[in-house]
Amino acid sequence: MIKEEIKVYENSQALSEGFTGFLQKLLDVYPHVNLSLSGGTTPKALFDYWSANCRDTIDWSRISFFWGDERCVPPEDVMNNFGMTKEHLFDNIPEIPANNIHRIHGENEPEEEAQWYSRVLNIDVPLRNGIPSFEIMMLGLGDDGHT
């Protein structure tokens, strides 16, 4: 098990390098990593970093992508977190298997989608004490302090 740590980085480049190093450590320990994503400018910078620097250095087949939040808009909307991830990561790294991408369908009726995604998480993510447990959960922090 990887030791839990809180790290603070000076800029998005340093964060991208540090996050990538942590991901590589997890891939050294676990056969498969479940990664929960968020939207925002920091993840976008990380996805751009991965697209430019990590296409051939990360075993993308061993990572499953989920989302911790999504807006109730279709993926073509600029506010959609999956759409941003697709544009800045998935479209640039075709080695990421489509069946490893588990998006929230923001275009669907919210309550039904929340119930559907809950089932997805309970089936596709290992449970710890009955709760889906991710190896990495990326949380955004807005200017107003929201997560």
What are these regions (language model features)?
Residues 40-44, 71-72:
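Short active-site-proximal "capping" loops at secondary-structure junctions
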Residues 50-55, 93:
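Active-site catalytic pocket residues across diverse enzymes, especially alpha/beta-hydrolases
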Residues 132-135, 143-147:
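Anionic-ligand binding region
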Residues 37-42, 139-143:
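Glycine-rich beta-strand-to-loop/alpha-helix junction loops that act as flexible
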Residues 34-38, 64-67:
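Short, conserved beta-strand segments within well-ordered enzyme catalytic domains
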Residues 1-3, 59-138:
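Ligand-binding beta-strand-loop-alpha-helix segment within the catalytic cores
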